[in-house]
């Protein structure tokens, strides 16, 4: 009996020792830590496997075998979160949107998306909210799975799959009425088709549902609302009942109001929002993802020489409406519509947010804790906090002193794995 007891004790000790030896610890020692809310000094961060084990002053004992990474002159931050991305698109000055949808095979588009995912991760963005494959069907679900399995490097993906548009509202447009072209999103007409599209996209892996609440649908190509209030309410109700969030592409005041009143979690773009609309967003707790970088990129593709030519009316108007949103106290997400411009250049949006009137501290919050909160992932990412996922980056210098320092990536850790050092 005594021998059996000793054997059990020895086995338990050996198993515990083996488990401890299997654990991987990394201690990060930067000059400062942005925890997702505030900049902290005198902090270190201990990572255990894929989780943040400790964050704060060095008051704890290091486990044996801990890897220590000195980050002198550097700032540690939560992995950045891109709030509006299209990994299956590439810059429109390389290939037009129509030609990407119509002429590039899905195999080519997926191959490009693999490269885009890696570039995004190495730029310090460890999570992306990818808001539609733009004609590549459900291939974002496969890309997401390949990243999760470790087949390819890339960020965590929050995916919308195909997105939903009103029949006849989107593109590409056919010049021959007898020819139906492939579309950049799933077309629907009426409540029954709405329900079918929502459930189909969820069944294929959608983490959220994206709807185009307005588009260039008017008789002269101007933006107009594309769904009625009843249809918008139906879409959001069906989405929310599945435990998911609905988000809306919207730029017109009426399209924005219909989406806000229906209960979407965020408005994407919001170019022509008014003081009234932004007050409604604040009241309803709806966030704005402004996509400043996409607008600037498109104007530059059209010939605008930034810093030399006067700002086009689109940019002047965007500055004005962004200020209205800030003054109304609307929650601002960080999302630039990457894909319109190069993946890996995601920090461009953060720089423009400062240029358009936000403080660097608010921009850092938007790209970390705020995005995590709005997207429903605050229990996992967006902060440097004990128990959260070890998605951590380090940049040279202090991004509060100069937001451009966010580009100087020195370290990228996602889920405890070092991808750049």
How would you name each of these model-derived features?
Residues 4-16:
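Bacterial N-terminal signal peptides
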Residues 23, 37-77:
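Histidine-rich, glycine-flanked metal-binding segment
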Residues 74-145, 149, 167, 230, ...:
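Metal-associated gating/positioning segment near the N- to mid-region
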Residues 88-109, 167-182, 218-228, 284-315:
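Active-site gating loops and adjacent loop-to-helix segments of metal-dependent hydrolytic enzymes
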Residues 91-93, 140, 169, 220, ...:
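Histidine/acidic-residue-rich catalytic or RNA/ligand-binding cores of hydrolases
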Residues 99-101, 241, 314-399:
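His/Asp/Glu-enriched, well-ordered alpha-helical/loop segment
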Residues 114-138, 154-163, 206-217, 245, ...:
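Divalent metal-dependent hydrolysis catalytic cores, especially in the metallo-beta-lactamase
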Residues 193-288, 312-331:
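Histidine/acidic residue-rich metal-binding segments in metalloenzymes
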């Amino acid at each position: 009996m005594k021998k059996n007891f000793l054997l059990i004790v020895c086995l338990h000790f050996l198993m515990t020792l083996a488990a401890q030896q299997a654990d991987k610890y990394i201690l990060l020692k930067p000059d400062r830590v942005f925890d997702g809310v505030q900049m902290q000094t005198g902090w270190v961060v201990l990572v255990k496997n894929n989780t943040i084990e400790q964050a704060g002053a060095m008051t704890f004992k290091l486990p044996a075998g801990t890897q220590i990474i000195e980050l002198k002159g550097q700032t540690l931050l939560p992995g950045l979160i891109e709030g509006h991305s299209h990994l299956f698109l590439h810059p429109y000055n390389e290939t037009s949107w129509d030609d990407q949808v119509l002429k590039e095979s899905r195999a080519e588009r997926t191959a490009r998306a693999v490269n885009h995912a890696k570039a995004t991760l190495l730029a310090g963005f460890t999570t992306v909210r990818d808001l539609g494959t733009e004609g590549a069907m459900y291939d974002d679900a496969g890309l997401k799975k390949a990243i999760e399995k470790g087949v390819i490097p890339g960020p965590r993906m929050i995916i919308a799959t195909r997105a939903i548009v009103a029949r006849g509202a989107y593109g590409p447009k056919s010049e021959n009425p007898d020819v139906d072209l492939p579309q950049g999103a799933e077309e629907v007409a009426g409540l029954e088709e709405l329900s079918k599209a929502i459930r189909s996209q969820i069944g294929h892996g959608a983490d959220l549902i994206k709807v185009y609440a307005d588009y260039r649908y008017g008789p002269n190509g101007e933006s107009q609302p594309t769904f009625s209030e009843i249809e918008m309410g139906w879409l959001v109700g069906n989405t929310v009942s599945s435990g998911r969030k609905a988000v809306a592409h919207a730029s017109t005041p009426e399209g924005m109001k219909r989406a806000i009143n229906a209960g979407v979690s965020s408005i994407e773009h919001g170019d022509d929002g008014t003081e009234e609309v932004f007050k409604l967003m604040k009241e309803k707790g709806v966030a704005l993802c402004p996509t400043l970088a996409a607008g600037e990129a498109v104007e530059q593709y059209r010939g605008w020489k930034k810093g030399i030519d006067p700002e086009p009316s689109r940019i002047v108007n965007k500055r004005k409406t962004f200020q209205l949103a800030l003054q109304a106290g609307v929650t601002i997400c960080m999302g630039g519509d990457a894909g319109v411009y190069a993946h890996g250049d995601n920090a461009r949006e953060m720089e423009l947010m400062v240029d358009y009137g936000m403080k660097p501290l608010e921009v850092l919050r938007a790209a970390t804790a705020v995005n995590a909160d709005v997207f429903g992932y605050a229990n996992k990412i967006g902060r440097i906090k004990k128990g959260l996922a070890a998605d951590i980056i380090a940049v040279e210098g202090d991004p509060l002193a100069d937001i451009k320092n966010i580009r100087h990536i020195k370290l990228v850790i996602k889920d405890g794995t070092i991808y750049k050092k």
